[in-house]
């Protein structure tokens, strides 16, 4: 019995160490870029030995793969929970509208995932091929919502790829063009969080127009946090951007 308990504690300690390494690496990839971060840098920052990192992951690329896998799991969980929070008896255009706009709010507040994706693009095809090859479930999930919308609104022209592209532009622009975002609303003395809300409203109105959502049906939160779904990320991808 004692050996079994010790085994469980050892397994738990190993898992906690892996999460610490991933959390540390993800933060460093966002701040410095994947290319500039070495295993030794991660080792020093995480306070674990270089050999232990190699034992758990083998290479820096494998750490990125593990982070990417966790991102997919988290996004899928978030999307399911988000869908559950939207009343099922709403018209399909409102369900899709709320889903898309609330999902962008999550990406604007919790910016680490989009930072990692952007940095992965800079590193070339190898990292991004892995990311894109892993997201079949995410594609299927979004496609089901769009297919239902098209069934109920056959006259509407909505491309799921264009919709995803717009979401990527809005998420990426706010995160990686932060000085320009702040400059846009500097005459209002807006905080960064208010700038993010203003930025989100541009997307919000665009999607409402595309999905035939009236002004009365639209979401107009006082803060983006008001429309977030609470779902902790075990390795810290839900860290909130400071205002």
Predicted stretch roles:
Residues 17-26, 42, 67-78:
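Generic hydrophobic, amphipathic alpha-helix propensity
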Residues 100-103, 116-121, 167, 171:
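Short alpha-helical scaffolding segments that buttress acidic/His motifs in well-ordered protein cores
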Residues 107-129, 177-183:
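Amphipathic alpha-helical segments used for helix-helix packing
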Residues 20, 28-62, 66:
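Helix-turn-helix
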Residues 3-8:
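Arg/Lys-rich, glycine/proline-spaced intrinsically disordered segments
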Residues 2, 147-151, 170-243:
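C-terminal peripheral helix-coil segments that are non-catalytic and often amphipathic
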Residues 66, 80-113, 152-155, 160-164:
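Hydrophobic alpha-helical connector segments
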Residues 76-80, 125-151, 162, 194-201:
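Amphipathic alpha-helical packing segments from all-alpha helical-bundle domains
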């Amino acid at each position: 019995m004692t050996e079994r308990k010790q085994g469980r504690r050892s397994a738990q300690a190993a898992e906690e160490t892996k999460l610490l390494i991933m959390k540390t690496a993800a933060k460093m990839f966002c701040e410095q870029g994947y290319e500039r971060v070495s295993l030794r840098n991660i080792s020093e920052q995480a306070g674990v030995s270089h050999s232990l990192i190699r034992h758990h992951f083998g290479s820096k690329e494998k750490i990125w793969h593990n982070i990417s896998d966790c991102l997919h799991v988290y996004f899928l969980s978030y999307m399911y929970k988000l869908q559950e929070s939207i009343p099922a008896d709403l018209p399909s255009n409102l369900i899709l509208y709320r889903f898309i706009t609330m999902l962008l709010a999550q990406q604007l507040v919790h910016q680490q995932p989009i930072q990692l994706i952007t940095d992965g693009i800079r590193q070339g095809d190898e990292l991004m091929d892995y990311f894109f090859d892993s997201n079949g479930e995410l594609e299927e999930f979004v496609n089901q919502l769009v297919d239902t919308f098209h069934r109920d609104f056959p006259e509407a022209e909505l491309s799921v790829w264009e919709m995803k592209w717009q979401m990527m532009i809005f998420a990426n622009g706010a995160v990686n063009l932060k000085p320009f975002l702040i400059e846009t609303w500097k005459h209002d003395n807006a905080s960064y969080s208010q700038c993010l809300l203003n930025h989100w409203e541009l997307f919000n109105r665009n999607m409402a127009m595309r999905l035939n959502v009236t002004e009365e049906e639209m979401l107009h939160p006082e803060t983006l946090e008001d429309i977030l779904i609470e779902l902790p990320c075990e390795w810290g991808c839900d860290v909130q951007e400071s205002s």
